[in-house]
Amino acid sequence: MALWGGRFTQAADSRFKSFNDSLRFDYRLAEQDIVGSIAWSKALVSVNVLSVQEQQQLEQALNHLLQSVQQDPEQILASDAEDIHSWVEQKLIEQVGDLGKKLHTGRSRNDQVATDLKLWCRDQGVHLLLALKTLQQQLVAVAAEHQSTVLPGYTHLQRAQPVTFTHWCLAYLEMFERDESRLTDALARLNTSPLGSGALAGTAYAIDREVLAADLGFTRATRNSLDAVSDRDHVMELMSVASISMLHLSRLAEDMIFYTTGEAGFIELADTVTSGSSLMPQKKNPDALELIRGKTGRVYGALAGMMMTVKALPLAYNKDMQEDKEGLFDALDTWFDCLQMAGLCFDGIKVNAARTLEAAKQGYSNATELADYLVAKGIPFREAHHIVGVAVVAAIGKGVALEELCLAELQQFSPLIEQDVYPILTIESCLEKRCALGGVSPKQVAHALQQAQARVKS
């Protein structure tokens, strides 16, 4: 059943109908469409379009339809309705007859779909916030188990300075907490009700839109009808939040993929998130992590596509906007799945502390400590930096670590170097000296972990 047939003398070409119809994807807005329709029916009572008895009859039928949809949303796809709004109205008329035809009074599909989409985004936001919080809790739990596990820190993917596995976990916690903050902000910004904006110029009925907004749980009604029906900022903002978070997930995945390699051997993932090779029986591939990394581009593509769609649209509604849903649905579904999968990768993870410590001791990651030692002896840092660089070259030439050079050899680079240098060059000293807020000293890491544990509980 089309909602607009009176103007036309010819039926739509079947190919156009297939091209134009959106039910195959906007059926996911069914619950929101029904909830919005219930609220609209109450508003129609206030302007004497519906009697109280009629509204109650409509609400009862809509609630029955809502229960049916919640039990089996896929049933909608068997219909030939143009979109979810048509389907709901058709089903309502089947239940209550001509009374169902009164529901759309004063309402356009333009403000209807804008409302549905915001309600859907709000509902999805709750699930995404929970998924982010769950991943944060998993990171903190793993971090708590590895406070004494030394890990090589990298710049340019070259060993740089030692850190700890806890510090590494908490670095990603910071990223996902920012994602949570961004999502919370975006959800607060979208929480305004377009319902009652009509097609573009507002509704002709003196409905109290603030009451209507409150009935649907919005903080307020939108202020401009032209903007309300054509605004898709919230779609792009949520996809942008998803894109940034997927970037963080991809970086996490890349780190962990590297850590699982035979060359690193820092961690081992559980069998439950890895796969094998059809040819090479020895393989254990980090497929879950690789898919997270791969799906990141998919979310970026959805955001870019949406921005290209709306970049030159005139006010107000245009059919181009029908393209907002598939990309949004896919982007948020993908983000949610990847958040869950990232958490799953931490279940049963094994950290090879002996190997991470061995790797942290290699690569002359204590060279900065020797430079700082010389600074303490009164040598300007830039000069100390050069002296240590020359010493590193000599150690490399001998195939030994800096701390394996004897005192006489070290004094060739600076006579100020004394026996007390050797305790300075240990891994323990390297960590201990990073004692400022946010550093890797055991005290600072313990403090950071304690704070993180408190945050993820709230």
UniProtKB/Swiss-Prot annotation:
Under the heading HAMAP family, the entry gives: Arg_succ_lyase (MF_00006)
Reactions accelerated catalytically:
2-(N(omega)-L-arginino)succinate = fumarate + L-arginine
Which GO terms of the cellular component aspect does the record hold? Answer: cytosol
- Keywords associated with the record: Amino-acid biosynthesis, Arginine biosynthesis, Cytoplasm, Lyase
Q: InterPro entries per the record? A: Arg_succ_lyase_C, Argininosuccinate_lyase, Fumarase/histidase_N, Fumarate_lyase_CS, Fumarate_lyase_fam, Fumarate_lyase_N, L-Aspartase-like
Question: What are the EC numbers?
Answer: 4.3.2.1
Q: Which Pfam families would you find in this protein's record? A: ASL_C2, Lyase_1
Pathways per UniProt? Amino-acid biosynthesis; L-arginine biosynthesis; L-arginine from L-ornithine and carbamoyl phosphate: step 3/3
Q: Where in the cell is it found?
A: Cytoplasm
- To which protein family does this belong? Belongs to the lyase 1 family. Argininosuccinate lyase subfamily.
Which EC class heads this enzyme's classification?
lyase
The record's Gene Ontology biological-process terms are: arginine biosynthetic process via ornithine; L-arginine biosynthetic process
Cross-referenced PROSITE patterns, in alphabetical order? FUMARATE_LYASES (PS00163)
- Please state the gene responsible for encoding this protein: argH
Its protein name is Argininosuccinate lyase
Tell me one GO molecular function of this protein: argininosuccinate lyase activity
